[in-house]
Amino acid sequence: ADIDVSRNWFVSIDIRKLYLKTDASGYLGPQEAKAKVTLDPLITSIAIGRQF
């Protein structure tokens, strides 16, 4: 969301939640390794901008 602070300046705020699931596999030497990976990061950003 962009919020006007004055005629030329604004603040932008963004919040996102992601849900990711994946399977990983590989070898650790001769031994096979497998993993199930679940990520759910909350990503936030705040920006200050100037319009001209």
From Swiss-Prot:
One of its GO terms (cellular component) is outer membrane. The keyword Chloroplast does not apply. Coiled coil: none annotated. Pfam families: OmpW. Pathway: Aromatic compound metabolism; naphthalene degradation. Keywords: Aromatic hydrocarbons catabolism, Plasmid. GO terms for biological process: catabolic process. InterPro entries: OMPW (IPR005618). The keyword Disulfide bond does not apply. It comes from the Bacteria. May be involved in the conversion of 2-hydroxy-4-(2'-oxo-3,5-cyclohexadienyl)-buta-2,4-dienoate to cis-O-hydroxybenzylidenepyruvate. DoxH and DoxJ encode different enzymes that may have interchangeable functions. This is Dibenzothiophene metabolism operon protein NahQ/DoxH. The gene is nahQ.
